[in-house]
């Protein structure tokens, strides 16, 4: 009886194709970043042309973004969504701030947190996320549907500048809508934090108002509006880019919405943090005194 040894498996062969495939991934990422930046610059650069030629479309987009359509209009549109998000964010700042400051016996400074944290970080991030989740995602889906149904190609055939007509108008509409929305958002954030601190935790209204008005500065509010305007530009250009370049049918449109939302949520925080560091990094612009 003879026993034959099992044949050893052939050694894995090095594949240059797989190496080149992995090496192309960073290149594709850099190419997409370049295309996105160029699209954003083109959309922003064609704003004056869009305001002259497509002002009716711009007004329609302002109305649609402000109050929404269909079921969203029933609950108050984007304004209601922004209000609910900022109310929750302001209440969380009050709850966490009062509990944390209470551990070291300075819960009276909760009004200081409302004047500082809400204006510089919480309200811009919450408003940007609400804008991305409502207006931005809708813009991506709408432009993506137009791309796969060849409506954007039809605009180009009719000698209509598709980027100006579709993207620039939405960027301007987002800027117009975000200013009153952010005014509402920051007001509700202040109100929710005061109600939570005074009525639920029982802090004196005079103590809260003293520290709130002491540390609330008008230039901080102005910089906060500048932050949220920059956030709106980034959010709208990002979502318009993914919708404009969508491909692959309805599945591709859904994937474009998901990618745009993920990138928007990241860029919102990055923009707010970098802006806050640029404005307050060298001088915090407040003196903490009891």
Task: Locate the predicted segments by residue.
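Short, membrane-interfacial amphipathic segments enriched in basic
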Residues: 8-60, 242-247
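Membrane-interface helix starts
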Residues: 49-59, 63-78, 265
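Short cytoplasmic-facing helical segments at TM-TM junctions of multi-pass membrane proteins
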Residues: 143-168, 249-253
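Membrane-interfacial helix-loop-helix connectors in multipass membrane proteins
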Residues: 87-119, 184-229, 238-259, 282-290
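Hydrophobic alpha-helical transmembrane segments of multi-pass membrane transport/permease proteins
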Residues: 72-91, 268-278
